[in-house]
């Protein structure tokens, strides 16, 4: 006997007004993740995933484009207010915050959550160019 066709249920997008933008700015790439208050990811974008490869991936403009792309998807969830958590020393720290502000989000506060070791692992050797 043939199985009755099951109807695919349309996934309901939850409406979130407040969110947290986690910006991870390393020397090589910038990752922007927008979550709800509980930490569940709503949208994310990277500089590499936005079409930048190689040394162009580690530029402030690439971080700006990544933040804009993550912001567009987050707007579909109804996010209006953002709290920004910035981690890392990379070049995309400031430009990603500016891009989120220009995208129409109201930034409530900015926090630097860069992990600082209490003399943990040995850091990488200094670059000689």
Swiss-Prot record:
GO terms for cellular component: ribonucleoprotein complex; ribosome. The keyword Transmembrane does not apply. It comes from the Bacteria. Disulfide bonds: none annotated. Keywords: Ribonucleoprotein, Ribosomal protein, RNA-binding, rRNA-binding. InterPro entries: Ribosomal_uS11, Ribosomal_uS11_bac-type, Ribosomal_uS11_CS, Ribosomal_uS11_sf. GO terms for biological process: translation. GO terms for molecular function: rRNA binding; structural constituent of ribosome. Located on the platform of the 30S subunit, it bridges several disparate RNA helices of the 16S rRNA. Forms part of the Shine-Dalgarno cleft in the 70S ribosome. NCBIfam families: PRK05309.1 (NF003698), uS11_bact (TIGR03632). Belongs to the universal ribosomal protein uS11 family. This is Small ribosomal subunit protein uS11. The gene is rpsK.
